[in-house]
Amino acid sequence: MRLSALILAQALLGLLLAPGASYSQTITDGDTLKLNGVTYRLWGIDAPEAKQDCPDGWPAGHLAATHLQSLISGHPLICERKDTDRFGRTVAICRAGGEDLGALMVRDGYAWAFLRYSADYAGQEALAKREGLGVHRHGCQPAWEWRQRERAKYE
């Protein structure tokens, strides 16, 4: 009887993680997503805020969220918890189709390596800078500086 239950559980898990499986996911911005009711903040990166534009008008925040959505689309999504942030979000390494979303976002120039917390994506950022991709091409202010400036407006 226990073997039957184990086989059934494995079959159900396979269906949940199968490509094209039905699960609820929403992109909040370029480094935050919601999967089946859990909010995940991508580990080791900081993407432009949703309303953040670069000095040349490039809509960095909107494009970062759109890029993250394109990376996820059509792939099974799995998140591995690393920590919880001060807002109660689960900080995690999330993979779509086996690819680390944080690494891809930084490598493609849609986020910065958040060196304050991790050096995991420093190499991807160096490559994006060298190739002048995304935020590096448009002279965007790092998201942590942009947030600080925005908060100061209301103090």
Question: Can you name each region flagged by the protein language model?
Answer:
Residues 2-7, 14-155:
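Small beta-barrel nucleic-acid-binding modules, primarily SNase/OB-fold domains
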